[in-house]
Amino acid sequence: MTKQVEIFTDGSCLGNPGPGGYGAILRYKQHEKTFSAGYFLTTNNRMELMAAIVALEALTSPCEVTLSTDSQYVRQGITQWIHNWKKRGWKTTDRKPVRNVDLWQRLDLAIQTHVIQWEWVKGHAGHPENERCDELAREGANSPTLEDTGYNPD
């Protein structure tokens, strides 16, 4: 039987761009694991993507996942936009390179073995897991330790 897993994610940036962090909660039955990290210079969208990527990459076998995010960018990107980006060689409709392509490609790879239901939750609206992820993300942003080597200000 396929494991049923819940993932909650959030990203934060102090300035955009600026120091940023992500937070994620992975829940399987009564077990819970949290993920958090901070980057010296990044964007909020990159941190939203990283939260989902890190949690999904932690899964060791195919799972049925409900992933909750307050980022429409992540949810729409992975459920709608990515299909045409891939068809166009990772270009947008106006033939420009997709922003954050390194992370979109990593997320695309991370979802391959799972069945994922992407859910949007309103941020800062009292959703307990989203609030906890927001805290984790802000903690990371307030004490960054990593370089976001894929961040490319353009």
From Swiss-Prot:
Name any Gene Ontology BP term: DNA replication, removal of RNA primer
Cofactor remark: Binds 1 Mg(2+) ion per subunit. May bind a second metal ion at a regulatory site, or after substrate binding.
UniProt entry tagged with the keyword Cytoplasm: yes
Establish whether keyword Lyase is in the entry: no
Annotated residues for binding of Mg(2+) 1? 10, 48, 70
**What Pfam families would the database entry show?**
RNase_H
Which superkingdom heads the taxonomic lineage of this protein's source?
Answer: Bacteria
Query: What's this protein's function?
Result: Endonuclease that specifically degrades the RNA of RNA-DNA hybrids.
By its UniProt entry, which HAMAP family does this protein fall under?
A: RNase_H
Q: Return the protein name.
A: Ribonuclease H
Which species is listed as the source? Yersinia enterocolitica serotype O:8 / biotype 1B (strain NCTC 13174 / 8081)
Q: Which gene encodes it?
A: rnhA
